From Swiss-Prot:
Homology family: Belongs to the CbiM family. NikM subfamily.
Name of this protein: Putative fused nickel transport protein NikMN
Species the sequence originates in: Archaeoglobus fulgidus (strain ATCC 49558 / DSM 4304 / JCM 9628 / NBRC 100126 / VC-16)
Matches recorded under PANTHER family: METAL TRANSPORT PROTEIN HI_1621-RELATED (PTHR34229:SF1)
Subcellular location: Cell membrane
Pfam families in the record: CbiM, PDGLE
UniProt-listed Gene3D superfamilies: 1.10.1760.20
């Protein structure tokens, strides 16, 4: 769902930069003085690691967990939006995952729409069944985020195809992929609620187990990259663009483009890139936590 450079008109890209900055700025304002736990940084790092696990899907595409609804459920909408924004910004600036001109739109879709919709859907129906609420929140959150992406691309003349193409492609694919997103969200929320209910209540942060899970996801990420490469995978948006004969026009190549290191074995490079990205996300997460406590 990461929109690359060249897909959005500059006016559309600029509009969503403004909207995203406004919402994130308000989120920072709402969090000032709050006692955020280290859960903020850990959730951000876990989502970054989970997004590196692209699993291939028959037909030449792939999918990965996005985690916006999960971030909202565990952190609340304001902290959840900031955590996702940290992940997306690092993905863009360090790994060129998503275009720099489209960063505002990507933040809007995955860090704002996905998080806020997921959070409020979950809260609205949580009292009936926690697991079902988390599943529905994950499914609706990612589907609406994809629909927004389809609208942004479809109204941009740069892409060359209108809403009749972009909305069905983005909406249908992600409504199906949302079933996996919802299942993972429900599984994680249910497990944490049973094992560490204080984490769900945001009164504590997960301990060494959470860090071990993050490390495990990073460790196996090269295997996922290898498996996906065998079937020639691409993400749904990239796959659709290829079928339409469109090409990306990257403006910024990133420090470690495509999660690799120049001159290094691609799978070792993926592992190192994952470690670097996780450390950066953790550091920024803890820095924002400290700022919120002292501001």
């Amino acid at each position: 769902m990461h929109i690359p450079d060249g897909y959005l008109d500059l006016s559309i890209a600029g509009l969503f930069y403004i909207l995203s900055i406004a919402v994130l700025g308000y989120s920072i304002y709402r969090l000032r003085g709050q006692k955020l736990t280290s859960l903020f940084g850990i959730v951000a790092a876990a989502i970054f690691a989970a997004q590196m696990l692209n699993w291939p899907i028959p037909g030449g595409t792939s999918a990965h967990f996005v985690g916006g609804a999960l971030a909202g459920i565990l952190l609340g909408p304001y902290a959840g939006a900031l955590a996702m924004a940290v992940v997306l910004t690092i993905q863009c600036l360090v790994f060129a995952d998503g275009g720099i001109t489209a960063l505002g739109a990507n933040v809007w879709n995955m860090a704002i729409v996905n998080v806020f919709v997921g959070y409020y859907v979950y809260r609205a129906i949580e009292r009936f069944n926690r697991s079902a609420a988390a599943f529905i929140a994950g499914w609706i959150g990612i589907t609406l985020a994809a629909i927004f992406a389809g609208i942004e691309i479809g109204i941009s003349t740069s892409f060359g195809y209108g809403l009749k193409v972009t909305l069905p492609v983005m909406g249908t694919w992600h409504a199906l992929l949302g079933l996996v997103e919802g299942t993972i969200t429900a599984g994680v929320v249910s497990y944490i609620a049973a094992a560490r209910p204080d984490v769900i209540e945001q009164k504590a942060a997960p301990g060494k187990l959470a860090l071990a899970v993050i490390a495990a996801m990073i460790a196996v990420s090269p295997l996922f990259a290898y498996a996906a490469e065998l079937v020639g995978y691409s993400e749904p948006l990239e796959n659709a663009a290829a079928m339409l004969g469109l090409e990306e026009n990257p403006i910024y190549e990133g420090l470690l483009p495509d999660y690799t290191l120049p001159g290094l074995d691609p799978y070792a490079g993926t592992l190192i890139a994952g470690i670097v990205g996780t450390v950066i996300v953790l550091a920024l997460g803890f820095a924002l936590t400290r700022y919120a406590r002292t501001a």
